Amino acid sequence: YKNLAKNEKGGKENSKEKSYENDNEIESNATLVTEDINSNILQIIYFDFDKSELSSISKKEIKKFLEKYENVISKFLIVGHTDTKGTKEYNYKLSIERANVVKNLLIDLRIKEENIKILGKGEIDLNIKTNDEVPHPANRRAEISPIN
């Protein structure tokens, strides 16, 4: 089991040991790489508040992820998520945008579109439970999982 978070500046943090109290405590567009066969989620990409753009470090990490698993995984599920800030409808659309951004990068990296499924969950399935309208960076993410 490997759990590693990299921030924009290239530093490393153990994501399981730190809780983020506000938006400023997690660096912009951090990428969490997990390798846990039991979790089935192999890559988590975090997003800035109200954004769906990938940082250059996130793009590099996704590329490394694909290179590592290119002979093992051929089909992918990308699930987009948001925090609870904003309306449920807006957050659902944003979660779809986040999943699509990751999907488009996978296509650019030569994964066939028919081998990628996306799902938007909006503010359902939060990593960190919060009250409505409370932003939390750990909830703003897209998860990449293999499809068997």
What are the residue ranges of the model-derived segments?
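Periplasmic OmpA-like peptidoglycan-binding domain that tethers envelope proteins to the cell wall
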Residues: 59, 81-148
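Periplasmic peptidoglycan-binding/tethering modules of Gram-negative envelope proteins
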Residues: 1-76
